Amino acid sequence: MKIAFKNFLTTLRRYKASSLLNVAGLTMAFTAFYVIMVQVWWELGYNRSIPDAERIYLVAPSGFWDKSGNSFAAQSPRPSCERLVERSPEIEAGGPLRAWFNTQPAWVMRNGDYVRMKLKVITASTGFIETMRATAAAGDLTDFVRPNTLLLARSEAERMGVGVGDAVWLADNPFRAAEVRPDRQYEVVGIYDDFPANSGLAEIEAMVDIGDDGMNEPNTWNDTFFVRLREGTDPAAIARRWSEINAEVQAAWAAKMRPLWIEQYGQEEVDSWDNDDDQTGCRLMPLSELYFERALESSHWNPGSRPTTLSLLAVALLVVAIALINFVNFFFALTPARLRTVNIFKVFGAPTASLRFSFLFEAAGFVLVSLLLSWYVASALRSTLLAEYISTSLALTDNLDVLLLETGVALAAALAAGIYPAWYITSFNPALAAKGSFAGSRGGRRLRTTLVAVQYVVSIVLIVFTFFCYAQHRFERRFDLGFEREQVLTFDAPRKIAAQPQSYEALVSRLAADPRIEGVTASQSPFVSDASTVWGRKWKGEEVDVHVRMVRPNFPEVMRIPMLEGGLRPEHGRDSIYHAIVPRSVADRFDFRPGEIVDNYISIAGISGDLQFRPLQYETKPLMMIADNKATRIVYLRIAPGSDIEDVCDGIRRAIGEVDPDNKAPDIRFMNEQIDDLYEKENRLMTVIALFALLAVVIALMGVFGLVLFETQYRRREIAVRKVMGATTDEILAMFNRRYVVITLVCFAVAAPAAWWGVERWLSGFAYRVPVSPWIFLAALAAVLAVTVATVTLRSLSAARSNPADAVKSE
């Protein structure tokens, strides 16, 4: 061991430049591996740290959205789910939560005064608490079934400074309350340990009891229902049972409602419904897999993208592979210089096994030094911008599992990279070894070329993928949504303005005085969003499910939505029936015509051009824009081009302060920024992939640099002879570049199909995507050729300009 350690130190001293290049490359690779794997580990472990997550399932019906079996709802009718739990001995526990993760005002008492705070409160049942095995930090979690009681997460209780028995006041309406209501006092009866941060339950800061809410509404889908199954239970069988139970519940409810429907719609219309297939499909989706479940229509439970996560994992492994190839090339580059030393040891009786162990120890030494340096670099990255692109902490102590995995990968890599070179260099017959030169042998050249080719293939694949990431991001930003989103500012209205239409009108009148503001409108929720309210109605014998956006009557005008027929008028927002605008594709699909009345209370007021109101990961759905003067939560303002935006925003804040002086000024943003937020996660991960793909290319070029260094050293005599025979510097440079240009072209031919396959798989996760253009592949080839020629030229230039006499003398 001592001799092996001394040999390792000797290698570091004797080959400083090559050793430094390899340590630098491995350090960068292991740093990239750690950072990427922290993110990948977080995503692959999403929801899995919840106790028995593999046996907890979401009840996800399909009938409300479509009956194709390709799309499932996160919400379900509570009566059918509760009856499923009652009839299924295979279910250990089950219960609903109303997963509306909205921040609402909450007040606590401090020195006799109400102190306003913010809190995310959801309604849930004791069955839900039992299903998730929530643990009590204080109090009794089952006590919240009593009226006016609530449970708090431990972190929120500490932040608010309250404990069991203390009082918290909640708003009666989370969207409209601005003042504390003394009669809305809740007693804290239990404090539970926070749910895991990498889970869909992490946002639950407080819970109140759902009681019997929804138990008499079998056609209302408001509740997210989870069940925990016993070991060995078939979830598909439970899903089929739910469909049967739901059909019974719906049939009983329809029989009860039939007289009212006949009175409202007529006997003939109601009789036509009897032929409908009301059997609603269902899937039980495991909680541990929800993060990547694209069949689930949800804006909360499935934020992950499996192709993106797998792409991250692939980049992490490929970066390490490229660095290890550099190491192997480095080892073989030293073979000619070290062969004589090895054979001297063998002549003097050194065991071959001992020599091989020494070389393996050397490989492990390089890897471990690089690994330790990478951990230092990773720790330093915690305070950099890169940390903001990772969903969790980069601290080493917070990611011990990743450290263990990386250490195992590093040691396995050291063994894999060192075992063949160690065997090879000790395999020569001592009497024959001095006669040949591995540096100039055909086998040596072939091996080095193959290793470099692998690096090039990987690098080209990563560059192509990075270019397509950028192209998809650019495509999303420029996608035509069907309205003019440029020059539009937006903000969340303060509570008084959101709650009182007259306050909104007062704000609009003040803003109208600014000639730079061309129009003001509002909606009840963000117009472009992954969350929707969905209405299901009967129309001409067909079940019509539409996504609803409640908007002010002038919304199409301000947003410059092209109207093909009809339109909204100011009085439409206050009529006794709703007035709706539908896009052309929706009108054609359901045969809507202006002036028709849907379900006796929705009048089709007009038809617009097609609109994209959801992120591009999702296919568009049928849309109705319904006029409502009470839709004042999200305000939109169209600004004249060339306006001083900061000055306009200051004027908006002053106007808000005049109307609602008790609330702080809102955050005013461009609508494009709000839309970009919908792609924030994908964009963050794309940036990480691009950064480390670039790093992989840099490491590969370091390998090329080292290989050219090796070749120029061992071809000095050839270069000298060529120069004596009249070769110019440019011709010498062309000789070196020609080989690497050919290698690049051959590698591109291999990499292009692999890159095409990977890009197609990744883009399949988007409903709207860029085409796989050959120009991007050619751009990647041009980029690789450019940096290769630059690298080879830079390194071989000194050899090409050297004095031939010096080379001949040294030989």
Regions found by a protein language model. Give the residues of each.
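Membrane-proximal extracellular/periplasmic loop immediately following the first transmembrane helix
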Residues: 36-107, 115, 213-214, 221-226, ...
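Hydrophobic alpha-helical transmembrane segments of multi-pass inner-membrane transport and secretion
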Residues: 14-41, 304-340, 368, 447-472, ...
